[in-house]
């Protein structure tokens, strides 16, 4: 069975939800929620426990970020699902180097749409976006590999207008430069991309006038 990262995040959210409600040890809670086929998948198991442990070990710092950007909302008044989705996303931002921050935010929003109220996705998006902008401006994001995907490069690089490897030509799509035409006319014109020499005027043939 192939399990997606979104499904792993959903399971992590369920574990954290039950952990908060039941007040039991996280290992016991996780054992009753995470399916055996996920535990048998080394990559899936590693990712889900990275998320869960990152949240639990850093929950005070994570909750501080949430509370800072939640206008007039106390943590204990927030929906438990929303709160744990935000905890997961912030944990990924700060402690999982290989996850792009915007992916973490988007995943939390989409899962909120499925499991929580109609207004939850906007609420989650607002707090996570504000948190992301804050930690990015302070330079506390430490990403590597795939985690660098949506972060700005240190130096702006200008794309080469003449790349060494041209893009693959789509099939069955006519080349706009193969047979150029004048606008609103079927008369072909000279291809401006063909050859390096400037067009030469036609040579006139001189004839002697008869006396």
Curated annotation (Swiss-Prot):
Keyword Transcription recorded: yes
UniProt entry keywords in alphabetical sequence: RNA-binding, Transcription, Transcription antitermination, Transcription regulation
Molecular-function annotations in GO: RNA binding
Polar residues compositional bias, start-end: 175-188
Record-level GO cellular component terms: cytosol
Flavoprotein found in the keyword field: no
Stored InterPro entries: NusB-like_sf, NusB_fam, NusB_RsmB_TIM44
GO terms of biological process kind: DNA-templated transcription termination; transcription antitermination
Region annotated Disordered, chain positions: 152-211
Function: Involved in transcription antitermination. Required for transcription of ribosomal RNA (rRNA) genes. Binds specifically to the boxA antiterminator sequence of the ribosomal RNA (rrn) operons.
Protein family membership: Belongs to the NusB family.
NCBIfam families: nusB (TIGR01951)
Protein name (record): Transcription antitermination protein NusB
